[in-house]
Amino acid sequence: MPELPEVETVCRGLQENIIGKKIVKSWLSEKNLRFPYPENFINKLKNRYIVQISRRARYILIHMDNQEILLIHLGMTGKLNFYQNYDNHKIKHDHIIIRFSDNSALIYNDVRRFGFADILHISEQADNKMLKDLELEPLSEDFNVQYLQKKLAGKKMNIKNIMMDNKIVVGVGNIYINESLFLSRISPKKSANEVKKEELDMLIKNIKNILQKAINKGGSTLRDYQNLDGDVGNFQFDFRVYGREDKNCVDCKTKIQRIRQNGRSSFFCPSCQR
C-alpha cells in the first residue's frame, strides 16, 4: 500500500503537471472501485480547471475552480499515470481517464480496485467520513513530544501499532514505523505507556527524518508503486530492518526478526531494540 512518502511524491508530480489544465472529458470503466463512483462523476469534472493539489494523510486532493475537490485514495495497488500526449490507448486495469484540453491525460489504474475516487465540495471537507477523524500530519511542527505524550498516556497497546493509528498521527505506515523504531532503538513490542519521554522525542525526530528522506527518494517500491511518470521509488535500498528477516543487523550483526502484530509484519533487531 502506498504510504505517506509515495502519496506525497504523486501529489508533487500532479502539482508539476496538471495545475491550470482544463478537463474536457472523462471516462470510467464499468467496474466499481472500493466504492461506487459518485453520481454525475463525469459531468462534475467536465470543463473544470485544476487550481491546487494537496494531500491529507494518504489522500490526494485535486482542487477545482468551482471549489469542488476530486478525492483519490490509491488503496493497495492504485497508481496515477500522466500522459503528455494521450493516444486513447487503454491498458488493463485502467478505471478513470481524465482528458485535458491540451491532449494530456491523467489515468487511474488499479489492479485490485481497493482504491476509490469521490467528489466533494470544499465546505464538506471537515465532515467527510474519510477525512474528519484524521489527526496531525507527522511532518507538522505540532507533532511533538508534548502532543504525543498526551495521546499515549495510559495506552497499553504496543508502540508500533499505536503509531499507525490515524487518530494519533496520520500516514506513518508499516514500512516507515519499522524503520523509525529501529533508529530510535525501541522494540515494536514495547507498550506505548512505557516509552520514556526521551525515547518519544527520538522517535518523533526519526519519523520526520525517515519520511523526508523517503520523499526525497521518491518513496519505496516493493511491488506496484510508481510515480506519475512511471518511475519507481528508491528508498527501499535504504531499509535497515523492513523486509530483512534473518539478515544481519546493520549495526550489531544480530539476526533481524519478524513477528506479526495486528495482521502486519514487524521487523526488528532484538539486540538493538528494547
Where would I find each of the regions flagged by the language model?
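A cross-family signal for N-terminal binding/gating loops and helix N-caps
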Residues: 1-109, 113-115, 248, 264-268, ...
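Generic detection of long, well-ordered alpha-helical segments
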Residues: 1-4, 88, 138, 142, ...
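Basic, nucleic-acid-binding surfaces and adjacent catalytic neighborhoods in DNA/RNA-processing proteins
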Residues: 22-41, 54, 147-274
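Phosphate/anion-contacting hairpin/loop surfaces
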Residues: 66, 70-171, 176-183, 191
